[in-house]
Amino acid sequence: MKLKKLALSAVLSIAISSVYAAELPNITILATGGTIAGSGQSAVSSAYQAGQLNIDTLIEAVPEMKTLANIKGEQVVKIGSQDMSDEVWLKLAKTINNQCANTDGFVITHGTDTMEETAYFLDMTVKCDKPVVLVGAMRPATEKSADGPLNLYNSIVVAKDKKSAKRGVLVAMNDVVLGARDVTKTKHHRRTNIQFAKLRYARLYS
């Protein structure tokens, strides 16, 4: 009798979990590398190599994201964004356009050196009405004060919000949301390196 009750409880738990997962939006993370996926020899060292960690590792580091959406990760490339190329840009645009009907939004993990160029290119070439959000970090994932995990979590918040749709490609970093045509990198060492003109999170979602 006890075994039957345990079995029934397990079945109900699985069923409830399945229903809960079905109600969550589906978000696809396209990973390209960058500092957000960087790895250093020490948690207190500023020396690191960009694009070392794969997307599964980044997702596992922020389990809270799974309460926001059904997360699917896809590793596009593993590079520092200084090595970003036309080939990768085209691959990102084609991937988003091809998968648009099968997801509720996209997040692209990216280095900050060429994030503005990638955002602008995708803004002109992506033909998808779902949210497309770029996110990066100024400190590698292995550093004690890494900013990537919170930035990644916030990018999922933005990508799952229906108000983000049909606004063009966005950049979400440091608690602000930026339009692709308004973003530029101005500082190379501070976490508040990404600057913008006029377009703020409060304006988008007020």
Task: Locate the predicted segments by residue.
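Gram-negative bacterial Sec-dependent N-terminal signal peptides
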Residues: 1-21
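Active-site histidine-anchored catalytic micro-motif
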Residues: 22-206
